[in-house]
């Protein structure tokens, strides 16, 4: 039996069917250009959601918003139930759980293939080890100080939180009518085939000023956290050397699985386009992500190299990985996708399982698109 790419411990293999990404009223603008227009979608554990549509329809921007490589103009993105816009959330902590593969591979040309794959696991693994060691070293002293001053400190924090919460509610009340008036001034114009949105400049300035105060107050509230006793935590590894050895062992396992074990010590410049993209995929998998995001992974490849990359993605999909894939490969979308989204003009105009999507399209724009590409 062939060795699997995903490990048995991979978290994406659990909780199948449970929503892992939820997008609520997502809007993204670049200046006055409306790129994403009030999108609400969800991705469930184990799903392979394929996004297709004409160029300029917002597909790649939507994908980049999912792990906050692009900041949404408005709306919410929840990952495992956590609002990524919440000021208390460590975005980088959640990005670790989302592997992303880009059109142009984005390998480090000054590092060997193996170093490309081990770079992030080693850096993060050692950082986590040091953090755990610091935590355990200072915990006894911290607990002594907490026992002596904790009650008084928490009393002060409670008063501060009450004051900040009151200010937050006041600012929200102040902001609401301004936003309503601002929305009423919205105008949309078609310029060179793109939707350009504009609002009243004075109301925009007033809205941003209040929103900025609200954000600063919410940030202060998020940092006003009551103290509590700490517990010692287990170390994630015995040593930095152990972290490196585990990362290198996993890198070689992944390279062996995709038939590139002999390329471990060469540099990316010596690889073909297809080999580079396969390395980019296993580099993302080396972090043991819960979701994989693919942004047109074959668009920069020569036609004869597309198949080897698609075969690898299919294998990862068959092993249970949750995926969101932007692609122009219609046959691949039909074969791999459990649900297909059609995006155009910044909106999801239609979505359905592959058989229904390709066999019985409903939206006129989708029928027009499929007639051109199939």
Where are these regions (language model features)?
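Conserved ABC ATPase signature
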Residues: 267-271, 275
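Conserved ABC transporter NBD signature motif
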Residues: 75-86, 130, 134-135
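Helix-to-loop junction immediately C-terminal to a conserved catalytic motif
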Residues: 67
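ABC ATPase NBD coupling module
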Residues: 84-99, 135, 142, 154, ...
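Catalytic Walker B motif of ABC-type/P-loop ATPase nucleotide-binding domains
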Residues: 292-295
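Conserved signature/switch motifs of ABC ATPase nucleotide-binding domains
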Residues: 266, 287, 319
């Amino acid at each position: 039996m062939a060795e699997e790419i995903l490990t048995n411990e991979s978290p994406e293999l659990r909780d199948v069917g449970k929503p892992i990404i939820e997008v609520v009223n997502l809007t993204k603008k670049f200046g006055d250009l409306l790129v994403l227009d009030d999108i609400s979608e969800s991705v469930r554990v184990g799903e392979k959601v394929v996004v297709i549509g004409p160029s300029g329809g917002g597909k790649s921007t939507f994908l980049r918003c999912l792990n906050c490589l692009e900041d949404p103009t408005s709306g919410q993105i929840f990952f495992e139930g956590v609002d990524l816009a919440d000021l208390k959330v460590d975005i980088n902590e959640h990005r670790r759980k989302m592997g992303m593969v880009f059109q142009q591979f984005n390998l480090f040309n000054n590092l060997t293939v193996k170093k490309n794959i081990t770079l992030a696991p080693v850096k993060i693994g050692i950082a986590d080890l040091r953090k755990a060691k610091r935590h355990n070293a200072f915990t006894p002293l911290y607990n002594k100080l907490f026992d002596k001053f904790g009650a008084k400190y928490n009393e002060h924090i409670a008063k501060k939180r009450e004051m900040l919460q009151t200010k937050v509610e006041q600012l929200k009340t102040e902001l609401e009518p301004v936003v309503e008036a601002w929305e009423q001034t919205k105008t949309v114009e078609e310029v060179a085939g793109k939707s350009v949105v504009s609002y009243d400049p004075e109301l925009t300035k007033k809205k941003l000023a209040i929103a900025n105060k609200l954000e600063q107050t919410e940030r202060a509230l998020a940092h006003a956290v009551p103290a509590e006793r700490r517990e010692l935590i287990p170390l994630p590894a015995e040593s930095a050397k152990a972290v490196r050895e585990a990362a290198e062992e996993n890198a070689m396992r992944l390279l062996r699985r995709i038939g590139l074990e002999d390329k471990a010590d060469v540099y990316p410049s010596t690889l073909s386009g297809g080999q580079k993209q396969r390395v980019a995929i296993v580099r993302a998998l080396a972090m043991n992500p819960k979701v994989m995001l693919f942004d047109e992974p074959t668009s920069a490849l020569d036609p004869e190299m597309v198949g080897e990359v698609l075969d690898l993605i299919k294998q990862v999909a068959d092993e249970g990985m949750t995926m969101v894939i932007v692609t122009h490969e219609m046959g691949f979308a039909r074969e791999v996708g459990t649900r297909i989204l059609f995006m155009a003009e910044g909106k999801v105009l239609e979505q359905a399982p592959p058989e229904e999507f390709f066999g019985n399209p409903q939206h006129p724009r989708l029928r027009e698109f499929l007639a051109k590409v199939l």
